[in-house]
Every structure is written in C-alpha cells, then in structure tokens.
Swiss-Prot record:
ATP binds at residues 15, 166-168, 234-235, 243, 249-250, 266, 270. Its cofactor is Mg(2+); K(+). Catalyzes the formation of S-adenosylmethionine (AdoMet) from methionine and ATP. The overall synthetic reaction is composed of two sequential steps, AdoMet formation and the subsequent tripolyphosphate hydrolysis which occurs prior to release of AdoMet from the enzyme. Homotetramer; dimer of dimers. PANTHER family: S-ADENOSYLMETHIONINE SYNTHETASE. This is S-adenosylmethionine synthase. Mg(2+) binds at residue 17. SUPFAM superfamilies: S-adenosylmethionine synthetase. The lineage of its organism: Bacteria, Pseudomonadati, Pseudomonadota, Betaproteobacteria, Neisseriales.
Length: 389
C-alpha cells in the first residue's frame, strides 16, 4: 500500500515574528474599538531591547501606541531582562504615516471610478477546508497549533515553570495514497525555549509526556513515531533576543500549513478594507461551508481583486475529485450565497470590530472562537438545499 508524507509547523506566541504580529493586531484592535472605519496598516519589528512601530494609519482614534505595544509584549511573557526582552525596558519607536490619498479614493465609497467600496489592493487569496479534523482543517497544521497552545498553557499555569515563551512545533504525517486519509504520525519536532537549569533529559521527557501525548490522537502515535525535542540540545536564548521578528512573516503558519496555496498577503495589522485579510477570511468561510454541507470533502477556492474595483476579478474552485456537484455549479452557488465584494465581506462577517488580537497567534483558521465569524457553518444547510442534495 503506497503512502506519502506531509509536514506542517506552528510557532508559539513568544516566537519573535508572532510577537510582532500580536503587537500589530493589538494596535489595530485599539484603533477599531474607537474608530471602526479607520484605515490601518500597522507593521512591527522587534529585536533585542527594541520595538519599532511603522506603517500607515488614518483614524480619529486617540491611542497610546507605546502602551499597547508594552502591554502586549508583557502579556506574551517577556517581562524581565533575563529573558532577553523586557516589555517595560525595551525602547519603543513610533513611525506611522497616513494612508495615501491615491489608495483611499479607490477604497472610499462614492470616490474613484468605481463608486462602490473598492478593494484596497490587487491580489489573490485562497481559502481551504477538508474533513481531516473537527474544525475542517488539515491535520498537521491543526495539531501543530494545539501543541503550541499546550506549551503556552503549561508555561503560564506554572505546571512546567522552566518553559519560556519562544517555541516551535512541526508534525510529519503519513497519508494513505489511495484514500487520502491520515494513517499515523511519523515525526514530532518540538523546540521550546527553557530555563538554563533544566537538563535536556528532563525537558525531553516532560515535553513528550505533558505536551505531546495529551494533545495528539493516541491511535496515530506508534512505536515508530520519532520525537525530536530541542534537537540542538539547548534553547535558552530566544524570542526577539534570538531573532529579529517582523509582522507578516508567518503566513503559512497563519493559514493552512502549506496544505493549500497562499496568495502572499499577510493578515496582522491590516483593517478589513484590505482584501489580503478580509477576502482570505471570506474564502475560508466559503470553503468550510461547502465541506460542512457535504458538497465535497476537500475544497479550495481562489479569488482575485483589482485595486479600487468592488467585484472580484476571478473566482475558481477545486474540490480535488471529491465534489458531489461540478465546480462550475459550486461557483454559481458561491456567487448566489456569498457577497465577495469588500463591503459585502465586511458586513457578512461583521469585521469592523476589535477581534483580531486573538487571531495573531495559533492560527487564524480552525478555531471556533465566538469572534471568528468566518469559522461559522451557517450557510451549509442552504448550500446543501440549493445543490439538491
């Protein structure tokens, strides 16, 4: 019987790139709480002792950006100089400009050539869903995120007091080539920052027994499963001291772990007029509802936009041979049941709210948080009925 391997990774909230994402989205939320129509493109850089805030923001909100950045870094867990990054001691620089009026006229309703709210940029976005996990996400990325959430939980509640904020997980999964189903877990890689006093042996045992085994399905762990725990042997220096972190540098972790294509646009720090974010969320919503409706067991959708134009320039769907109806009919159903114009997406998913901070670590998809409207399957029944199934 033929098999193939597939791998995805996740990183913790203390990973430097994720620190940057969370600061950017915390600033976005602070602005949207006061000014839901604000235009925000908030970028963040973190390095040893330094946090740089830059980008374009047009808003009436009065926000203490430095305070928001420090509070976010502190909540993540970088609150002392011995960790190499201290929320209270690091320098924070603020370098925001306003949104270009040339861009604004294409996005503002009633301005520009298309009087509807146009897309904030050109670009292509993908959405994906499959039936491998309860939240209709690919197996490897779903469980990589769960491993990182478990690491954070045990760090914060003190059960493993030697854990530090920075960590990464990677899962290699064996699939059956004929059925496309997960057969077993081949390799688990987990690297976590730690207190220098803990031994590699003690750390490895605790990570396997208290982080990995409680999270992963036991029937998929075999005697052949390989565990690679802190394979360099030491991970004391981490976070922004170990590596410079930037907003938008973990786009595959944020989405489908490489199981679906990515259009290239990052999410964090961007208000919902940016289709990089809002249309990617809408695509996930569409794909998840198609799978939840039983119209396919695997669904990938691509949309594209032109700056200043409201209607998508293209919509395509691939169900990889699992569809109950043709892809042409699926596209027609999508056009009938989902408004994929920028303003339609914002209204459909209620996106003008301060809901983004929670999305900036552990994945934007596959988490059924009440704020994550794009994870609802409320269109599944109507799609199924319209398809005649």
């Amino acid at each position: 019987m033929s098999e193939y391997l597939f791998t995805s990774e996740s990183v913790s909230e203390g990973h430097p790139d994720k620190v940057a994402d969370q600061v950017s989205d915390a600033i976005l939320d602070a602005i949207l709480a006061q000014d839901p129509k604000a235009r925000v493109a908030a970028e963040t850089l973190v390095n040893t002792g330094l946090c740089v805030l830059a980008g374009e923001i047009t808003t009436t909100a009065q926000v203490d950006y430095i305070k928001v950045a420090r509070e976010t870094i502190k909540r993540i867990g970088y609150n002392s100089s011995e960790l190499g990054f201290d929320a209270n001691g690091c320098a924070v620089g603020v370098y925001y400009d306003q949104q270009s009026p040339d861009i604004a006229q294409g996005v503002n309703e009633g301005e520009g050539i298309d009087l509807n709210q146009g897309a904030g940029d050109q670009g292509l976005m993908f959405g994906y869903a499959c039936d491998e996990t309860p939240t209709l996400m690919p197996f490897a990325i779903y469980y990589s995120h769960r491993l990182m959430q478990r690491q954070s939980e045990l760090r914060k509640d003190g059960r493993l007091p030697w854990l530090r904020p920075d960590a990464k997980a990677q899962l290699t999964v064996v699939y059956d080539s004929e059925t496309g189903k997960v057969k077993r877990i081949d390799t688990v890689v987990l690297s976590t920052q730690h207190d220098p006093a803990i031994s590699q042996e003690e750390l490895s045992k605790a990570v396997i027994e208290q982080i990995i085994k409680p999270v992963l399905p036991p029937e998929l762990l075999t005697d052949e499963t390989k565990y690679l725990i802190n394979p360099t042997g030491r991970f004391v220096i981490g976070g922004p001291q170990g590596d410079c972190g930037l907003t938008g540098r973990k786009i595959i972790v944020d989405t489908y772990g490489g199981a679906a294509p990515h259009g290239g646009g990052a999410f964090s720090g961007k208000d919902p007029s940016k289709v990089d974010r809002s249309a990617a969320y809408a695509c996930r919503y569409v794909a998840k509802n198609i799978v939840a409706a039983g119209l396919a067991t695997q669904c990938q959708i691509q949309v594209s936009y032109a700056i200043g134009v409201a209607e998508p320039t293209s919509i395509s769907i691939d169900t990889f041979g699992t569809g109950k109806i043709s892809e042409e009919k699926l596209i027609a159903l999508v056009c009938e049941h989902f408004d994929l114009r920028p303003k339609g997406i914002v209204q459909m998913l209620d996106l003008l709210r301060p809901i983004y901070g929670k999305s900036a670590a552990y994945g934007h998809f596959g988490r059924e948080e009440p704020e994550f409207t794009w994870e609802r399957t409320d269109k599944a029944a109507s799609l199924k009925a319209a398809a005649g199934l």
